[in-house]
Amino acid sequence: MTLRAGVLAVQGDVSEHGDAIERAAAAHDRTAEVVEIREAGLVPDCDVLLLPGGESTTISRLIHREGIAEEIESHVEAGKPVLATCAGLIVSATDAQDDRVDTLNVIDVSVERNAFGRQRDSFEAPLDVTGLNESFPAVFIRAPVIDYVGEDVEVLATWDDRPVAVRDGPVVGTSFHPELTEDPRIHDLAFFDSVES
């Protein structure tokens, strides 16, 4: 069975997320059809969604203007999986701590933007992630940090005692960029565990 994976293609590592979902699918003897989402009308036909990084205020403005935001919210309400990374996490949160970001309210967290510093302060760290047998090589680039977690949200990983990966129902959010490694396990955790269970 082919998994139809929509990647929000407004900003961020679109092709890298596509490659990661294809690697994760191959590990399950499946294929993935990657659909780049730039306009409304494509999300309803997707099995899973990826919301990449970029600039959260720009992403928020564009998805609301193009009518994509409502489709993402409906996707989540239908219980379909989403992986939201870095700015995607910020846009998905209930509170972005920035009035310029009109959030989707699909992950019950409050997120502080750029909490781990500027681009020059970017780093890689091995993370212990719930559901993974070995540590994950997480890449943090001007990463946000989660400073409030709702009671129904599962914390999957922390760094420096602060949540950096969470699951809220069908949505997995990460402060880091899992697509910038050759390791597809975060995509696997977000999609195939949910899709096949």
UniProtKB/Swiss-Prot annotation:
Pfam families: SNO
Pathway linked to the protein: Cofactor biosynthesis; pyridoxal 5'-phosphate biosynthesis
HAMAP family xref list: PdxT (MF_01615)
Family: Belongs to the glutaminase PdxT/SNO family.
NCBIfam families reported in the protein's UniProt record: PLP_synth_Pdx2
Subunit structure: In the presence of PdxS, forms a dodecamer of heterodimers. Only shows activity in the heterodimer.
Protein name as annotated: Pyridoxal 5'-phosphate synthase subunit PdxT
Organism field: Haloarcula marismortui (strain ATCC 43049 / DSM 3752 / JCM 8966 / VKM B-1809)
Gene: pdxT
